[in-house]
């Protein structure tokens, strides 16, 4: 066992902490105990740059005294520390204002089935082996082409995590997961200047990742194809978001449908249940029980059971992403999304990105986005971009130093196709997305 505590030990600590909270005057309480450990190594130009070992543990206790809430945390699991942390949370609660929406999620909503989602796969990797993998990755990139003349480094990361959540409804559950990754970033140059790009892979199970040599070679190829980038004339064009950036595009939709933004009136999709936000041929599903996915879980951060569901069906919003608190604020029922969304799937209309390029004809393929020019209150969207200009369905040349702009509501409704090319490493399976028109500002 890699961890310092067994699952049973963490469950006992959690139950004991909740008992302390009740004995100290809490009306109700919830606690989570977590442990993590891992290592990260990075190399640059064949030399070791960094070796890090990480081992953490934490307790977060939230207490409710009537409708008052207090929260405290500690990294010390000793009896005295548990008592002091509970006391601190109780003291905080007594000085906070009452909140009618504060409290645990309903007991009837607690998860009753906690199965194995195959998310935990130890990688017993020595530091020397991790360094060798990073060097192999970087060397594969540097050997791809003589124009790859520098490196920002390659890295290997392993992470092992376990977590226990419990509350005074009597719910308590344990889950564990792993997260392993390999990445590489290099620089290429020619007579027109320099460009950089990167690639990585990650998985719960290290055997499922691409070989380090393939990751390095992909990083090099992505960098080389950016050489001799130029701008494009300002105008209105179709824009194809590569799958690597399409996840972020749909992420703005997820954020706008999230309870916190909705009850604070800081979303451009307020009161959107039953309204069309995507074309009729698109649906967005949440699938929280997918095996070996980083975001899979049978219960959310409040112990509420998670369920597969449509968030958007045939273009129409069917549900939000709600915790019990945001649900109470909105007069609704929690959707089991305390802690965020779980594995989103956007259906596809085309087999490949090449099919979407043909559909687009002439326009912009975006592979990188820069800046924070997204206003989630108004839905205004304006970001720096780089990618490729496309003519007659074929990539013509790389582009940079451009800005793409639009309104998210219009952009979502103007989607005309989604490719079946989502990356395996992503919890949100969103393929390349083609938008019929956006403003592109170039030279």
Question: Which residue stretches match the model-derived regions?
Answer:
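Active-site bordering "gate/hinge" segments
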Residues: 1-297, 301-304, 313-314, 394, ...
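Dual-mode signal for accessory low-complexity, basic/Gly-rich regions
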Residues: 114, 270-443
